[in-house]
Amino acid sequence: RFPFVEIHPRDACAAGVIDGGFARIETDFGQCVLKVIVTDRQQPGMLFVPIHWSDETSSSARVGALVAPHVDPYSGQPENKATPVALSPCDYPQHGFALSRDVLSFPESVWWTRVAVTGGYGYLLASKRDVQWQAWFNEGCSEHDIAEYLDGAGGIYRAASFNGDRLTRCLFVEPSDRTSDWDIIKALFAVETVNAEQRRLLLSGKALDGIASVGPIVCACFGVGRNTICDALKSGAARSHLDLGTQLKAG
């Protein structure tokens, strides 16, 4: 899941940020770039941001760096809830994702966050149009077979690398108003080998025979999707939240 900031609709309107977009949050001590959730469950004049992400798991979501270094004189607890912030929209016209068997390093201007996937590392991405994605991908996969799809005018780039019959890395980048089903690609990434038909259809982003979409991620720690949870409930394999935790590790 994306690192996010929750904001009241009235404050979102005043700041010029929209639900599903990105916002830059700045204080005298640091800044973050986060996905925006506009909701009336948040109090006007207040923001909510989880503290789960670090520099190892996201490019710009370390909330602790924003907080004023004031502590309670007795308990030593930080004054996390009283730091003034400035909020402004941050535009990323391209979104995408990457999967790799190894940890990836992205161009400095790319916004990224790491997500748990089976068999390697998953990343959700956002960027400006000037990032040279094709050059970046080819530089990191020079020793493997590479398949590519490029639509320069449409701002679409998709690529996959293979070591024999094993998918080793893939990248999907497209305009922010389009959404490829990365659940399908994650499922294919989890298997040991891909057949010729799966390899041919991989860059289409469409459903592949024998590979089911897990749906939107509900449990980020173990990469458990909504479809997986619903299937377990419908089949009777799980009848309670305790069953889901035991079988799927979903919290």
Which ranges hold each PLM region?
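General structural feature for long, well-ordered alpha-helical segments within catalytic domains
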Residues: 8, 32, 225-228, 240
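Helix-rich C-terminal "cap"/substrate-channel and partner-interaction subdomain
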Residues: 100-238, 250-251
